[in-house]
């Protein structure tokens, strides 16, 4: 049985910042997989993805890097265009191609303890697929994709129409401050976390950018600091890197505060370059230690 099974589309991304335009592979699945691959193999990991035939070489490269990848065919690979503001906290998006959604049939062979669902668009994972997976293991969700709908090529923010159905069988959720407000209607992070918990989620993570993050679990809040990077180069995949660090720690029975700090330190290192997390666990620990002196 695999400790963490991450499900999601690998994308082709065109990321534009005030400094540069970079074309690269991306998506929650991609960033989470590479983050796990740079951590000691105490936690077993499998990536389950769908790409168009033209992007099979990307998955082959991941396999050659040592990542366990299961690939299902899709008519197209998702193609995102991300344009970031100067502080990297704001982003506008377009989708130039969409991939096929995941099906229950594709989920049947999987044997994960935790299924991390990396939705990119609102129709990637139906409630039926999530409910089916919840009978096989714990459910961890990155909410971002459920709040995005494509009309033409433009990405429009939407409410999460099936949220109550899906949250009722969700163990862990990660949202940012914008997503929490859309989902709950609440502006206060602590109130929003409590509402998500009331809807059935056991562990709620709210990321607050440079203000850090909060974790709500077992009726208690944990305040997690943000560690300042040496420079901000590219925020793409930062939230996914946080999820990877958190799940890596929690799978080993590590406590919420320590897991949150580990995840935050991974984000700091990720911010300092384009592409997925590529540092060592020693560098992650060094950031935490430096700020706790």
Where are these regions (language model features)?
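Active-site metal-binding loops of divalent metal-dependent hydrolases
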Residues: 8-10, 28, 241
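Histidine-anchored nucleotide/phosphate-binding helix
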Residues: 27-38
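Conserved beta-alpha-beta core of the PfkB/ribokinase-like small-molecule kinase fold
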Residues: 118-194
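Conserved phosphate-binding/catalytic region of the ribokinase-like
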Residues: 156-164, 190-293
